[in-house]
């Protein structure tokens, strides 16, 4: 209707109908959480469009956009997925996006029963999510690049998504 917000394009996965999107795009946290919901709905409803979209997006993410640490979201601007095979050492790799990889992978394992999805869950958890929190549990990193010139952690952040996302995944 007239009160609807304008489309935000690939950033918000609303440039075209979700089921018509050939690849996972846009803001990495948004996209992985949306993909998690699609896979969970596919498990519940068995709808072929949901199943095909979840598999296509996961294959695209795991095959072309996933870092060795299980991180996603290479582009600093908009904290988003880059183009295929864009995997720079100074990539953004937001901690919450790795949590999204974990959730998406877990939902795909539930949907298909294939253990390969849990391999990626473990990769994201052990190499990115856990790296995003200090051993004390009191400090966090918002991003986890492969190569950095600093190792700062913060107790709070203006965008405080990491602490609750961390708690969500360790309780999964």
Regions inferred by a protein language model and the residue ranges of each:
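Glycan-recognition and catalytic cores of secretory/periplasmic carbohydrate-active enzymes
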Residues: 1-172
């Amino acid at each position: 209707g007239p009160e609807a917000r304008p489309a935000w394009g690939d950033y918000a996965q609303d440039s075209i109908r979700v089921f018509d999107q050939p690849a996972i795009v846009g803001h990495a946290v948004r996209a992985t959480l949306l993909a998690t919901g699609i896979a969970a709905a596919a498990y519940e409803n068995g709808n072929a469009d949901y199943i095909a979209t979840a598999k296509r997006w996961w294959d695209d993410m795991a095959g072309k956009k996933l870092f060795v640490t299980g991180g996603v979201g290479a582009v600093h601007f908009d904290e988003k997925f880059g183009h295929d095979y864009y995997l720079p050492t100074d990539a953004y790799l937001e901690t919450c996006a790795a949590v999204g990889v974990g959730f998406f992978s877990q939902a795909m394992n539930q949907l298909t029963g294939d253990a390969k999805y849990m391999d990626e869950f473990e990769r994201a958890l052990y190499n990115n999510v856990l790296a995003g929190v200090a051993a004390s549990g009191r400090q966090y990193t918002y991003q986890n690049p492969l190569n950095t010139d600093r190792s700062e952690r913060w107790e709070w952040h203006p965008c405080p998504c990491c602490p609750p996302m961390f708690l969500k995944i360790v309780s999964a």
